[in-house]
Curated annotation (Swiss-Prot):
The lineage of its organism: Eukaryota, Cryptophyceae, Pyrenomonadales, Geminigeraceae, Guillardia. GO terms for molecular function: GTP binding; GTPase activity; metal ion binding; structural constituent of cytoskeleton. This is Tubulin beta chain, nucleomorph. It comes from Guillardia theta (Cryptophyte). InterPro entries: Beta-tubulin_BS, Beta_tubulin, Tub_FtsZ_C, Tubulin, Tubulin/FtsZ-like_C, Tubulin/FtsZ_2-layer-sand-dom, Tubulin/FtsZ_GTPase_sf, Tubulin_C. Dimer of alpha and beta chains. A typical microtubule is a hollow water-filled tube with an outer diameter of 25 nm and an inner diameter of 15 nM. Alpha-beta heterodimers associate head-to-tail to form protofilaments running lengthwise along the microtubule wall with the beta-tubulin subunit facing the microtubule plus end conferring a structural polarity. Microtubules usually have 13 protofilaments but different protofilament numbers can be found in some organisms and specialized cells.
Length: 441
């Protein structure tokens, strides 16, 4: 089987991760003790991708939980699904990273890294044919960003040919809980550009917008936000976990979505999004899903795809849907919105259909877009970074842990390069002149 080892780092990563396991356990018919209670063969057919079967017919997630302070771990352990995880797979320190990337990457995190890697090795050795790793973390804090990127580079060193995919919660323009987010985020992106294969960018502000605007929630909690993220994670991984007509795996996804190695930062979306009670009052068609999926209001990163162009995109449908219908919709959306797709990659939407819909729905779709408008996100962080770095504000916290100003400058210029690469491909046109000159002779 094509197994995936899941690693969740820091407070944000552990909360998103816990929700993800709750959602997919539900889909696979695994209860809070890891016992299978489902009644469909397809639930169990590819369950090995994410679960390990142990004695007594129990299923244990291939998950490694890492944090530099015990708080979040304790609440995961005390939650409904806390008994699901293998107790040895909780790796935690006592000191915390205090929102400091340098602590997570160089000092506190480095002390814990070996014990985390040991468990990751153990999990990987139990796989028949390891497909890759997925990391859930945030880029604004200290542990998820600093130690998360350290783990990614260590895993990369040991497993260079396996896929590395991350669900990264990026700092949002209006919702900020840490003053030093721009530093932590820039230093992390510097790492992710080099060491990750696929980065799904999620940001809290876009999630809040969806909660207010679409789900009509008055006071959304982090629980509601995590629910949205887990819906996307479940949708993206659906065709890895269930038999379907058009399957996809992490590598196929990367091959279809990454036209140039550094440009692997994706926007994600999910459809149908409706307020909790209104689901049963509407019938969805593939057309509705497609419209909603490509709508900027459904994007979980605060970037508007209309300001850029899609290099590539992927649509993962779930439910009893004919592949023909999906193909027709994809062609139609490309024709209708042709100015939002680059013309030098024809047929740039990959689609996949998985027969099993999420619980309580007839059909759903997850969307992944590689759009040049993601540069807005990097630009925003870059501007905030510059404003503080010019005055060397808060820098002593980082240099005190042994960091060098050079590292900041490097990370900043790497991010600026990334922005200009996206811009360059956004402006690139089909080169017709090359052919026209030949007529002269």
């Amino acid at each position: 089987m094509r197994e995936i080892v899941h690693v969740q780092v820091g407070q944000c990563g552990n909360q998103i991760g816990a929700k993800f396991w709750e959602v997919i356990s539900h889909e696979h018919g695994v209860d809070t003790n890891g016992t299978y209670f489902g009644n469909k063969d397809n639930q169990i057919e590819k369950i090995d991708v994410y679960y390990n079967e142990v004695s007594g017919n129990r299923f244990v997630p291939r998950a490694v939980l890492v944090d530099l302070e015990p708080g979040t771990m304790d609440s995961v352990r005390a939650s409904n699904y806390g008994r699901l995880f293998r107790p040895d797979n909780f790796v935690f320190g006592q000191s915390g990273a205090g929102n400091n990337w340098a602590k997570g990457h160089y000092t506190e995190g480095a002390e814990l890294i070996e014990s985390a890697m040991d468990i990751i090795r153990k999990e990987s050795e139990q796989c028949e044919c390891l497909q890759g790793f997925q990391i859930a973390h945030s880029l604004g804090g200290g542990t998820g960003s600093g130690m998360g990127t350290l783990l990614i580079s260590k895993i990369r060193e040991e497993y260079p040919d396996r896929m590395m995919c991350t669900y990264s919660v990026v700092p949002s323009p209006k919702v900020s809980d840490t003053v030093v987010e721009p530093y932590n985020c820039t230093l992390s992106i510097h790492q992710l550009v080099e060491n990750a294969d696929e980065v799904f960018c999620i940001d809290n502000e876009a999630l809040y917008d969806i909660c207010f605007r679409t789900l009509k929630l008055v006071t959304p909690s982090y629980g509601d936000l995590n629910h949205l993220v887990s819906a996307v994670m479940s949708g993206i991984t659906c065709s890895l976990r269930f038999p379907g007509q058009l399957n996809a795996d992490l590598r196929k996804l990367a091959v279809n979505l990454v036209p140039f190695p550094r440009l692997h930062f994706f926007m994600v979306g999910f459809a149908p999004l409706g307020s909790r009670g209104s689901q049963q009052y509407r019938s969805m068609t593939v057309n509705d899903l497609t419209q909603q999926m490509f709508d900027s209001k459904n994007m979980m990163a605060a970037c508007d795809p209309k300001n850029g162009r899609y290099l590539t995109a992927a649509a993962y449908f779930r439910g009893k849907i004919s592949t023909k219908e999906v193909d027709d919709q994809m062609i139609e959306i490309q024709n209708k919105q042709s100015e939002h797709f680059v013309e030098w990659i024809p047929h740039n939407i990959k689609s996949s259909v998985c027969d099993i819909p999420p619980k309580g729905m007839k059909m759903s779709a997850a969307f992944i877009g590689n759009s040049t408008s993601i540069q807005e996100l990097f630009k925003r962080v870059g501007e905030q970074f510059q404003a503080m770095f010019r005055r060397k504000a808060f820098l002593h916290w980082y240099t005190g842990e042994g960091m060098d100003e050079m590292e900041f400058t490097e990370a900043e210029s790497n991010m600026q390069d990334l922005v200009s690469e996206y811009q360059q491909y956004q402006d690139a046109k089909m080169d017709n002149d090359a052919f026209e000159d030949q007529d002269l002779y």
